[in-house]
């Protein structure tokens, strides 16, 4: 099952992007960039391990997981609680990701 890999990839991507955000937008130390780059490399490596017959399909399905994980990060790390529109948007995206992941293909 690809779901645990998608979740780990999302955590790695968000952590890596947040490191850059912290340096550029919040004035954080440039030392944040090293773990940020490592996290982004881990993200790419993890995404290559998911079960998919095409890279584009893996990336598209991952998008729904990424959106949900991003909202979780926003709440847990940034202290901003998602509102009902965030939740609705995430639900729609997850439904789309499920169609991509679980559709019967012949």
Swiss-Prot record:
InterPro entries referenced in this protein's UniProt entry, alphabetically: UPF0060
Location(s), subcellular: Cell inner membrane
GO CC terms, sorted: plasma membrane
Coiled-coil region(s): none
Predominant cellular place of this UniProt entry's protein: membrane
Record-stated family: Belongs to the UPF0060 family.
Name listed for the protein in its UniProt record: UPF0060 membrane protein AZC_0909
Source organism (scientific name): Azorhizobium caulinodans (strain ATCC 43989 / DSM 5975 / JCM 20966 / LMG 6465 / NBRC 14845 / NCIMB 13405 / ORS 571)
């Amino acid at each position: 099952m690809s779901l645990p890999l998608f979740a780990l990839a999302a955590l790695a991507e968000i952590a890596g992007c947040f490191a850059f955000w912290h340096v550029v937008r919040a004035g954080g130390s440039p030392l944040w960039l090293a773990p940020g780059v490592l996290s982004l490399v881990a993200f790419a490596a993890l995404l290559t391990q998911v079960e998919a017959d095409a890279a584009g399909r893996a990336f598209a399905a991952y998008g729904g997981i990424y959106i949900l994980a991003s909202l979780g990060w926003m709440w847990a790390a940034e202290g901003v609680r998602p509102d009902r529109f965030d939740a609705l948007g995430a639900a729609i995206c997850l439904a789309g990701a499920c169609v991509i992941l679980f559709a019967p293909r012949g």
